[in-house]
Amino acid sequence: MMEIRNLAGLSPDALFAAFSEAFADYEITLDQQQYQKMLSRRGFDAALSFGAFEDGRLLSFTCNGTGIFNGQRTAYDTGTGTLKEYRGKGLASKVFEASIPYLTAAGIRQYLLEVLQHNEAAISVYRKMGFKVSREFNYFVAATDALQLKEKSLQDEYILKSLTPDDLTDPSPMWDFVPSWQNSFESIQRKPEDFRVIG
């Protein structure tokens, strides 16, 4: 019998196994250490994340992160997946719908997610659940050792130098845009050791 419940009692190994199986045909792959870092940076909250289980096996899941976004308590979809043989049965929608009362009771006021633009199946599911596109991002990745991040003087008044995330205060007053959840200041503060800061 199918049961939808939170992921609080699920081991990290079992969650990663389900994630790996659900995303086996996805273009981006993560090992378990990368997956755990991703969950940590995105504010993963197992008690507010949910899955559909059958005979103890996780078939479909939504891992939610929580935090503040645009001044409101927010849940962020850090990853929704369904095992291949269970896709097309509406499980992702059922898991999401079952989570709403718990998210609301936890003070969540908005729900945010990001999806690759060419992932038409996911976009279709999210649109059916009432989501709308609010903005689009370009995504670039480079190893820090490939970047030319040298300390230097720009003018007499300005010097670029290495900082630690602890040296930073809230940078939002200087922003001319709001970063994505994954690149928010709160996300950086969750895993500061993963960043090199120049300022």
Regions found by a protein language model. Name each.
Residues 12, 19, 27-55, 59-66, ...:
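Active-site rim helix/loop that mediates acceptor-substrate recognition in acyltransferases
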Residues 68-74:
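A short, polar/charged loop-to-alpha-helix boundary motif
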Residues 27, 32, 128-199:
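Amide-forming acyltransferase catalytic core, primarily the GNAT-like/NAT-type
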Residues 87, 96-104:
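A conserved short alpha-helix in the GNAT/GCN5 acetyltransferase fold that borders
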Residues 103-114:
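Conserved GNAT acetyl-CoA-binding A-motif
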Residues 89, 93, 109, 117-135:
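Conserved active-site alpha-helix within GNAT-family acetyltransferase domains
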Residues 79-87:
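A short, internal acetyl-CoA/4′-phosphopantetheine-binding micro-motif in the GNAT/acyltransferase core
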